[in-house]
Amino acid sequence: MARPRKPLLSRDRIVGAASALVDSEGLDAVSTRRLAAVLGVSGPSLYNHFRNKEEILDAVADAVSVQVDLSMFEESDPRDWREALHDWALSYRAALAAHPHIVPVLARGPGRRPAGLRVADAVFGAMTGAGWPPAQATRIGALMRYFITGSALGSFAGGFVDDETAYDPADYPHLGQAHLLADHRRQVDEGAFETGLRALLDGLAIQYGQYARPTDGRPSTA
């Protein structure tokens, strides 16, 4: 019998199958046995491409990081750091919102993941390029990751049930409309993220004049 022209298995195929499982069923659904069954191969064959399940999940996480737009850091003037961070944060959150089950893996940090490291490098480079001292640029990167991944770990509006009787006014006098939140989940959650992001960036802009080193010989401005 003729040998197949292409290998039956590849890293991309494994990552694609694992990503689909994570998206549909969550992290616990991923195992080498389950992946092998989905891919129609033997379990040990996966180890020709990945050492263990954690490496597979890292690759799934990195595939999400690839979706984050970094062009604003390459195209913007260094002094436009605030708007660049804003646009990047929206892109990052959109990528996480599309794949919420992988967020706990991404929240651990980039580790050795190439795409994740490119994100960290782009943010740090943009901040130091705008005049932020390296130590403060590091803190900004950490702050943004905490804020973005934290917002993607769960829905505030989705945490309230669509049942008016759950919020007895005798017990919760200020939650009379809480049962309506679930129907407006996207509006509430995206609005909250934008409000928090603007407040965060406004605060950084105030600090900018205190910390930043001029990038062009002129006084730094907030």
What are these model-predicted stretches?
Residues 13, 55, 87, 118, ...:
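Amphipathic alpha-helical interaction segments
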Residues 13, 17, 21-59:
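Helix-turn-helix
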Residues 1-8, 12, 74, 209-222:
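Actinobacteria-biased recognition of intrinsically disordered, low-complexity terminal regions
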Residues 63-68:
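Short, basic, alpha-helical segments at the C-terminal edge of helix-turn-helix-like DNA-binding modules
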Residues 157-222:
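C-terminal peripheral helix-coil segments that are non-catalytic and often amphipathic
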Residues 70-115, 134, 144:
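Hydrophobic alpha-helical connector segments
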Residues 117-169, 182, 204-207:
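Hydrophobic alpha-helical bundle segments that form small-molecule/ligand-binding pockets
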